[in-house]
Each structure stands twice: as structure tokens, then as C-alpha cells.
Amino acid sequence: MKLTSHDIIRKPIITEKSMASMAEKRYTFIVHVDANKSQIKRAVEEVFNVKVESVNTINGLGKTKRMGVHVGKRSDYKKAIVTLTEESNGIEFFEGMQ
């Protein structure tokens, strides 16, 4: 399956820790599980029109949940922490949240 840039970036993560790291031009996203670092870098540069310096990824396993005797599982996820270059402006989407 060919992933487009909008398929790769699922949603931003808005937490106290991620908001504090925005001062250092680091932004956190939930991304597609099959996306690699180079695809994530290309997608962020294309969608937000910025230059990316580095991408760090974290794979999260979904928890097993029970409802009585029924057992289910939450979806696995991948988190990407994207660092922008010094000359790059911040991402406008996040500007009002600081």
C-alpha cells in the first residue's frame, strides 16, 4: 500500500511535555505504524512546509483489555518526535497552543 503524506501523519500529540518541547522546535505526532523515518521526514516537510533536522520514533504496543470474559486489544501505534532546523519557522498549526 502506497502511503501519502496525509496518510503517514495521523494526528498531533498535545500533552504538557510535548508543548514544552515546542520551544526547542520539537513536535510530536502519531504516525502510521508502517512508516519509516525518511517517509515521516518527507511527509512533515511536504505538509507543513518546514525543514526537518531529525526524526525519532517510538513503537507502542496496544494494551490488552477485558470486558467480562471477552478479551480485546487496543491498536498498536507509532509516535514520531520531529526536530526542525534552526532556520526553519515553527509549524503554524501549533502556534496558538503555546
Swiss-Prot record:
GO biological process, one term: translation
GO CC, alphabetical: ribonucleoprotein complex; ribosome
Molecular function terms from GO: rRNA binding; structural constituent of ribosome
Pfam families found in the cross-reference section: Ribosomal_L23
Keywords, in A-Z order: Ribonucleoprotein, Ribosomal protein, RNA-binding, rRNA-binding
Protein origin, superkingdom: Bacteria
Protein family membership: Belongs to the universal ribosomal protein uL23 family.
PANTHER family, per the entry: 60S RIBOSOMAL PROTEIN L23A (PTHR11620)
Functional note: One of the early assembly proteins it binds 23S rRNA. One of the proteins that surrounds the polypeptide exit tunnel on the outside of the ribosome. Forms the main docking site for trigger factor binding to the ribosome.
Subunit (UniProt): Part of the 50S ribosomal subunit. Contacts protein L29, and trigger factor when it is bound to the ribosome.
Protein name: Large ribosomal subunit protein uL23
Name of the gene this protein is made from: rplW
